[in-house]
UniProtKB/Swiss-Prot annotation:
Membrane-spanning residues: none
Alphabetical UniProt keywords: Amino-acid biosynthesis, Cytoplasm, One-carbon metabolism, Pyridoxal phosphate, Transferase
Cofactor entry: pyridoxal 5'-phosphate
Gene Ontology MF term list: glycine hydroxymethyltransferase activity; pyridoxal phosphate binding
Catalytic activities: (6R)-5,10-methylene-5,6,7,8-tetrahydrofolate + glycine + H2O = (6S)-5,6,7,8-tetrahydrofolate + L-serine
Gene Ontology biological-process entries: glycine biosynthetic process from serine; tetrahydrofolate interconversion
PROSITE patterns: SHMT (PS00096)
Database matches in HAMAP family: SHMT
Organism per entry: Serratia proteamaculans (strain 568)
Name of protein: Serine hydroxymethyltransferase
Length: 417
């Protein structure tokens, strides 16, 4: 018999110590990695529930195992909420991650060797959109598109490439692009050659749910997202579609299970259901509006301090500092800011002279700091601290002074009160 008082601390002190240290790190560091966020205690309650014990291969009402009557309710709640939140008429909540969701789309609609058009990773795309180091870049013939000298998607060039290469699929979406994508224009280009338009909205799903960023669901054939990042739910994936194409929906379902996965993670799906309900609350819209305001406020400060921002600004939750003119690498900036308890990630910039392991840029995002209560005044101050560190990257006194300021504001604005 398992006793409920069993705990990690008494059984595995070494593991528990590392877990506790991570809690302290999250509370005492300012998190600016654009893909990270803090999920609610309700979501964590779902993920730590007895649902983790249940195997449920198949879909609600069509399982291969018995005893699924209650997890069917859980999954159907998640499906219905996802459809309502994003205006879709199809949703699959089973993908274990955004990458798994993307590969389910590829499996459903492509054959190895088919041509796809995806945003260049160095211009803000994602590994799973055809990067040569990713399986998507090995299985398919990839034609990359990028951004112009103003940092915007060049739709005219995209249309020309589409006409030249006749891809079977055009991929929209990004991991480090701060502009607004014209989904209708992308669909127009896809339709002109009879291609699928597939949009990976993982980075902006929360903003889209709140009406702060344009929704691709009415325009794309298929949309995927993660359920963490701006959506602030558990780590996982989601596939959406609209248009009533039942044949497409069957292909997508089969590509997830049994095509790419076995049993779904029911405790995570419960967490997704909770997060999707939270995203329907008025407070969530206010939060996402603040995420965008905070990103713009930070950009204003770094530009005033003489730093270059790719695209010249931001229209979402992130921006990319281009450090080429500062003779700094992204790796150096990442490390120095880390010593000041400010967590960012090094990131390639367009036409980056450095390798992906070094880079010439830093990606900065505001979902996590906004989640803990930062407003415009707070992030303006924070942006100034970032510039102070980057201006004096080898001055440990500056880094220590900044770290003290970080600890003070983190104590004032905790993640979990």
């Amino acid at each position: 018999m398992l006793k409920r008082e069993m705990n990690i601390a008494d059984y595995d002190a070494e593991l528990w110590r590392a877990m506790e240290q991570e809690v302290v790190r999250q509370e005492e560091h300012i998190e600016l990695i654009a893909s990270e966020n803090y999920t609610s205690p309700r979501v964590m309650q779902a993920q730590g529930s007895q649902l983790t014990n249940k195997y449920a291969e198949g879909y609600p009402g069509k399982r291969y195992y018995g005893g699924c009557e209650y997890v069917d309710i859980v999954e159907q709640l998640a499906i219905d909420r996802a459809k309502e939140l994003f205006g879709a008429d199809y949703a699959n909540v089973q993908p274990h991650s955004g990458s798994q969701a993307n590969f389910a789309v590829y499996t459903a609609l492509l054959q190895p060797g088919d041509t796809i058009l995806g945003m260049n990773l160095a211009h803000g795309g994602h590994l799973t959109h055809g990067s040569p180091v990713n399986l998507s870049g090995k299985l398919y013939n990839v034609v990359p598109y990028g951004i112009d000298e103003k940092g915007q998607i060049d739709y005219e060039d995209l249309a020309k490439q589409a006409q030249t290469h006749k891809p079977k699929m055009i991929i929209g979406g990004f991991s480090a692009f701060s502009g607004i994508v014209d989904w209708a224009k992308m669909r127009e280009i896809a339709d002109s050659i009879g291609a699928y338009l597939f949009v990976d909205m993982a980075h902006v799903a929360g903003l889209i749910a709140a009406g702060v960023y344009p929704n691709p669901v009415p325009h794309a054939h298929i949309v995927t997202t993660t359920t963490h990042k701006t959506l602030a739910g558990p780590r996982g994936g989601l596939i959406l579609a609209k248009g009533g194409d039942e044949d497409l929906y069957k292909k997508l379902n089969s590509a997830v299970f049994p095509g790419g996965q076995g049993g779904p993670l029911m405790h995570v799906i419960a967490g997704k259901a909770v997060a999707l309900k939270e995203a329907m609350e008025p407070e969530f819209k206010i939060y996402q509006q603040q995420v965008a305001k905070n990103a713009k406020a930070m950009v204003e400060v770094v530009l005033e301090r003489g730093y270059k921002v790719v695209s010249g600004g931001t229209h979402n939750h992130l921006f990319l500092l281009d450090l080429v003119d500062k003779n700094l690498t992204g790796k150096e900036a990442d490390a120095a800011l880390g010593r000041a308890n400010i967590t960012v990630n090094k990131n390639s910039v367009p036409n980056d002279p450095k390798s992906p392991f070094v880079t010439s840029g830093v990606r900065i995002g505001t979902p996590a700091v906004t989640r803990r209560g930062f407003k415009e005044a707070d992030v303006r101050e924070l942006a100034g601290w970032i510039c102070d560190v980057l201006d004096n990257i080898n001055d440990e006194a500056t880094i220590e002074r900044t770290k003290k300021k970080v600890l003070d504001i983190c104590a004032r604005l905790p993640v979990y009160a």
